[in-house]
Amino acid sequence: MRAALVCLLAIIHREALRFVSQRGRFLAAIVRPLVWLIVFAAGFRAALGLSIQPPYLTYITYEIYIVPGLCGMIQLFSGMQSSLSLVYDREMGSMRLLLTSPIPRWWLLFCKLFASTIISIFQVYTFLAIAGLLGIGFSPSGYAAILPALILNGLMLGALGLLLSSTINQLENFAGVMNFVIFPMFFLSTALYPLWKMAEASTILRDICAFNPFSHGVELIRFALYGQVDWIALLWVVFAFAVFLFVSLWGYDPSRGMVRRKA
């Protein structure tokens, strides 16, 4: 038990040091959603009318609507960046040393997931603080209530990145696959538009959005900001996390997985 805790703290410390040393990564993580919030929202404010739907009790501005989606976007990019570092570590050989330690492999990978989730949560709260300074804020209780939602969403997206990293053996291939996953997952979700708005354009797109795990992660954050729980979204996120993690652990198993030659 003590060894497992030491392992967790060591990996969190390692990821934190790596994050601090990569200032450009932090800057990009904050600037990217701010550009969407300031520029994109201003352009689409008049074009996208929003009806009153849970968790909202009154009409809201488009800026308020997309904040949960931008929080999810931060965690999505953070999860993929963390997985990119896994591919790099595997190419450099440090992953082999880590995975051959006496600590169970599944715990090592979970520690990596948890560390990347903590970093993504720090980025989200930094973004929310800046958004609050721009006049787009929420209640103090809402900021506290989203923490469990951010943890679950971060773990789910981190597990997805872990799954992708278990299938890719070369660093140069990961960027293309990462973009192939990130952008469809983000745009085909409720991050930017509500489901009913998507249904007006295409029922097929609406169904894709409804089955997208990222949509449910965004809705979990959205409801949590108002002190509510979207139970369907919660079940989806937990289920997706379990599936992604299970396949990832299988992929990193040297006897059965997809990276046995590299790990």
Where does each model-flagged region fall?
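Transmembrane helix segments
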Residues: A42, A46-L48, S165-F211, S215
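Short hydrophobic, aromatic-rich alpha-helical segments embedded in or entering the lipid bilayer
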Residues: A3-H13, A191-L235
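Short amphipathic alpha-helical coupling elements at transmembrane boundaries
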Residues: A10, R14-R18, G93-T100, N169, ...
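Transmembrane helix-boundary elements of multi-pass transport/secretion proteins
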Residues: E15-M92, V124, I136-I146, G176, ...
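Helix-loop-helix units of permease transmembrane domains in multi-pass membrane transporters
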Residues: S85-T117
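Alpha-helical transmembrane segments and their short interhelical loops
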Residues: R105-N179, Q228-G251
